[in-house]
Amino acid sequence: MTVLVSRWVGAVSLRYRLYAVGAPGQMRRMRRMVCMTISAASFAPEYAAVADAPRSDDYARLTRIRERLLALNYSYDAVQELLGVEAAEAMARDQVVPGLWRVEHILRGGYSAGEKNLARLLAFFLLARPLTEAEAAEVFGDTLVDFENAALIERDAADSARWSASVDLRPHAADDGTEIFVAADLGAHQRPGVLRKNHVLGIGHASLTLAQITERTPVKRALDVGTGCGIQTFHLLAHAEHVTATDISERALAFTRFNLLLNAQTLNIDPQNPQARVSLRMGSLLEPVAGELFDLVVSNPPFVITPRVAGESAEEQFTYRDGGLPGDEIVSTMVRQLPSVLVPGGRAQMLGNWEIIRDSEDLEAPRPWDERPRAWVADGGAEAWFIQREALTPASYAETWLKDASENRDRSHYEQTYVAYLNDFASRNVHSIGFGMIWLRRPTEATAAGATDPLQRFEEITYPIQQPIARALTGSVRRYDRLAAMDDEALLATHLEVAEDVTEERHGRPGAEHPSVILLRAGSGLCRTQLLSTETAGFASASDGELAVGQIVAALAMLLSWPEYDEAAAAARGTQEQHPRDTLLHAVRELVLKSFLHFSDEHAGAESAGESTAEAQG
């Protein structure tokens, strides 16, 4: 560390002497750059020059790199347009051949010099196409040495006359127009052999899913657990005053530091004081922030279930996906412990896996998928909403993750590890493995005291949904909170209306006087479908915001000849024989929670059943 500081001090004083003889304007600009350089150096300096990771120990160098990328028009839209739909979609599947074919077509065709250089650049960083000496000079110009010194590019190991990318460096765009550059390790489709154990994951389907489910309401303090290349932190900075990013990997924090400083201007980070908005900490799960409280926590934890090996060390594990614990314990640990770092009412969004156990009486059948997740929150320490998106058999799960790290390239190793996966799942009687989205909230004082019922929801939604769904989920939670504070009398006085994206479907036999099936469909968000009874169909049809719930219920009671409602008698009957009014009000609450119905005083369109402004795209 002393050597690093000395080098910084020496570099700064040398720069100042060189520019001390310049014009006054040059001197002012250089003093500002020196100040920024010193300040950037004091920001998590231990991650500025980590081996085999991008170097962020020279802010002036990062500025020149960013300016070169911008000059080359290296943007999300430009890359998509140059590649075309087919090649871009193939890249999303980690297939590089269509992209390489497209690039060669551009280089041979009548395209402009700028388009050809953009093609070379994207092929270099995204498709693992090396550059010749002449091409590198054309693409990088006088910043070639900056890219090399920042450990972004290197001489090709097989041919020193060529250059290869050391990292995957790509543009990433948010729907609000924000665009940044994100560096991560080269993926399995960009490099030979098995991934390195301390691989730093880039922008993938899981990270984008998490970004799309994360609530974007303004908060003071946010926490990103398992930051990786920093992608969640970058999105959090748009609505959090300060973000703490943690990871067990020193290399991951080095990538995050590099990306933060490379994009400091776009992310509204002052290079003279980065610590004002971001802090980086190394450690496992919540250990680095023990005793602290946050308004919002996001995490794409290393949740991949991996067979444990006796005597294995952390260096032998794929740290980007393997938390080192057996089964789904990494996710259960996170779910149980997250409330301890949340303020009352604070929320967390994360992704996870959970094991679904075989039924003891029918080994071919599973027990309920939510059995284990329910147990994790049974103590009431957190309100919870689990949405299972898919479930894989042990064999399919093993194949997915063996391929993910390119462990299928060595046949002997592949078969041996495949068997280990099957043995591991069999040892716990696992039928399948669920994957999905997790929303958590630390109960408020009122909820903890029992004044309102805690939100506990477990849904399986395996059909396509309209991402991003963050605002749809937020709207549902707000409606739940409002409903939870209402008894039936308050609900009867409320005005409801059908959400704008909801349509009704009626099905019946040809010639039949009445439909046999009536459905409501949400056209966005979670895209739910709800089967309606005659009563709920009638209620939905009359819910235009003008009539109170009680008025509609009274009209239905008369139309359907319900017996007179006696509150004392209803209480005596309990749940064994509910009055039609109670049944209907329960169904109405469910329609509101599922966002088919809205409170009529909600801001128009602000919280539709699926309305969601795109939080991220990539």
Which residues does each predicted region cover?
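Flexible, glycine-/basic-rich loop-and-beta segments that form/coincide
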Residues: 387, 394-477
